[in-house]
């Protein structure tokens, strides 16, 4: 069984139930972390929410964010007003293959959670970058989290 599990990434997989469960669990975790366990400040949240919810059909959205840990992407879902239970509005994210796709269980969970496996340092001409392009061509949202190091 391939660790990339393209079949698990399809919205119709098992009637969409696994995706709904994973998105709801991650959304609930994010809301708990962002709202109750941390002080969160979001700049221009209204702009992001408008783009996620109201952009014209078939118009893609790309977001790029800096991150410090592997929890940064899911924790971003927790700010006020973010649609944490809507699988259609949830983003696709490029996810490090060596962390998120280490075994069949992780691969399955991350694929139904709309993660695209990427080999860090593999450049732009790698297999799953084409999947990210397909998602964008379908008008979906692709999020890219990059570690931008501060200059010293």
Predicted feature residues:
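Soluble catalytic domains of membrane acyltransferases
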Residues: 39-152
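A transmembrane-helix-recognition feature enriched in membrane-embedded lipid enzymes
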Residues: 2-46, 78, 82, 104-113
